[in-house]
A protein has these predicted regions:
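Charge-dense, helix-prone N-terminal extensions
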Residues: 1-115
């Protein structure tokens, strides 16, 4: 199974986890899989992990949880998407908290105005 297919399968798991919060769709996104609500990407699944969109305020909770940005290698160089941070394991494991963090990420995506 390719990295992209693994990401899509895991993304579907998160769609199920977030079903009580909102209708979520998924689409491949540069080898990852984007999670969308009403056309706005607010999360990505990449290399077996879930990443939510952050802003300066929400990033503090991720830093406190010792999380990290979505990192990747391109042309042999390390890069990071600083606007996406890995969702901490304790959040992923608690559906109610996961939905709260997803709502925050979605609100941040709305502020960005990007589809």
């Amino acid at each position: 199974m390719t990295q992209s297919k693994r990401a899509e399968a895991l993304a579907e798991h998160y769609v199920d986890q977030l079903a009580s919060w909102a209708h979520i769709s998924t689409r491949p996104l540069f080898g990852a899989c984007g999670l969308y609500r009403q056309g706005h990407v607010f999360a990505m699944v990449w290399q077996g992990a879930l990443y939510f969109k952050v802003d300066d305020d929400s990033r503090l909770a991720y830093v406190a949880a010792q999380s990290h940005t979505l990192g990747y290698v391109s042309n042999g160089e390390q890069h990071a998407l600083k606007s996406y941070w890995e969702v901490p394991a304790d959040v992923v494991e608690d559906r109610e908290t996961l939905c709260l963090w997803a709502e925050r990420a979605y609100q941040i995506a709305l502020q960005g105005g990007k589809h």
